[in-house]
């Protein structure tokens, strides 16, 4: 059995670690709220843009419009945009998304396609750059804001557009972590390009709100409802041709989709970090309790031994 000083030092160390993990949990909770606020602030523009595209879709047939972002061609090369975090200590967040990318990459190779990677986040960059013999990396992005903004999504959008319009990639998919609840998030695969005309309208869109109840953090979700007043008048006349309108609006729509994926990923990362730090705090509390019990037993045994030695010495 370890001596009393070693056990006492271990107890102090565990308690200090618990203070750190608890502080990190609270910081992550505050940042989740910031991520929530950012989503809500960007929502009006995203909603209005989707409504405008939906109305244009109802006025013209997208299939008859010559827009490069809507054109489908024979698929040979596919770009995968992978979004991970720059830091760890967030449970299985990074591991799960990297596994999803590996599985999807292997599937595409098996199907005869030529996949390549556009990596976002230091964790993905570090992992796949150490395996360059197995994966083709097109570009990397790191050190984005913890609460993503349009500036963060702009660079990724430009790279995605350049790959697709130059026909270096015939399809672009994004793999990110969808925010579900504070204790649940899942990696998902979504096609970015070519854009699907039938998928312009944001159906079943959700807004999440982080609230507190009985000193516990909860997530409230509500579906985004369409506002009939947003519909354009049927007699409105567009000065620009449908091609010009779509060439201006579709890149904005694409950037908004990427921004949303970044925001969902950021919220998922912070939620996973909250959960991981909460579990670490609970484990530290349990370990400290066990060590206290061990310390008390060791101290009792030492005292008993000293008493026996004193009694034995008196008898002699």
Curated annotation (Swiss-Prot):
It comes from Prochlorococcus marinus (strain MIT 9515). F-type ATPases have 2 components, CF(1) - the catalytic core - and CF(0) - the membrane proton channel. CF(1) has five subunits: alpha(3), beta(3), gamma(1), delta(1), epsilon(1). CF(0) has three main subunits: a, b and c. It is found in: Cellular thylakoid membrane. One of its GO terms (molecular function) is proton-transporting ATP synthase activity, rotational mechanism. The gene is atpG. This is ATP synthase gamma chain. Keywords: ATP synthesis, CF(1), Hydrogen ion transport, Ion transport, Membrane, Thylakoid, Transport. It is a peripheral membrane protein. The lineage of its organism: Bacteria, Bacillati, Cyanobacteriota, Cyanophyceae, Synechococcales. Produces ATP from ADP in the presence of a proton gradient across the membrane. The gamma chain is believed to be important in regulating ATPase activity and the flow of protons through the CF(0) complex. The keyword Cell membrane does not apply.
């Amino acid at each position: 059995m370890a001596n009393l000083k070693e056990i006492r030092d271990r107890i102090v160390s565990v308690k200090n670690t618990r203070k750190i993990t608890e502080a990190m949990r609270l910081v992550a909770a505050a940042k989740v709220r910031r991520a929530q606020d950012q989503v809500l602030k960007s929502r009006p523009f995203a909603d209005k843009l989707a409504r405008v595209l939906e109305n244009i879709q109802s006025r013209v047939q997208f299939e008859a419009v010559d827009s490069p972002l809507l054109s489908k061609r024979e698929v040979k090369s596919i770009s995968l945009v992978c979004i991970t975090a720059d830091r760890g200590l967030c449970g299985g967040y990074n591991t799960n998304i990297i596994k999803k990318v590996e599985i999807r990459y292997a599937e595409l190779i098996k199907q005869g396609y030529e996949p390549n990677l556009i990596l976002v986040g230091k964790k993905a960059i570090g992992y796949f750059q150490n395996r360059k013999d197995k994966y083709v990396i097109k570009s990397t992005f790191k050190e984005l804001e913890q609460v993503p903004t349009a500036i963060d999504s702009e660079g990724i959008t430009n790279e995605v557009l350049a790959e697709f319009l130059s026909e270096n990639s015939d399809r672009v998919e994004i793999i990110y972590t969808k925010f579900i609840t504070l204790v649940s998030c899942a990696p998902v695969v979504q096609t970015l390009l070519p854009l699907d005309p039938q998928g312009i309208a944001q159906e079943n869109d959700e807004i999440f709100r982080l609230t507190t109840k009985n000193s516990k953090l909860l997530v409230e979700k509500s579906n985004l409802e369409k506002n009939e007043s947003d519909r354009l008048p049927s007699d409105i006349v567009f000065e620009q041709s449908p091609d010009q309108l779509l060439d201006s609006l579709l890149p904005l729509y694409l950037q908004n989709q990427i921004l949303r994926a970044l925001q969902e990923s950021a919220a998922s990362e912070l939620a996973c970090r909250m959960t991981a730090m909460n579990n670490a705090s609970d484990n530290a509390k349990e370990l400290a309790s066990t060590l206290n019990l061990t310390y008390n037993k060791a101290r009792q045994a030492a005292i008993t031994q000293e008493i026996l030695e004193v009694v034995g010495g008196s008898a002699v």
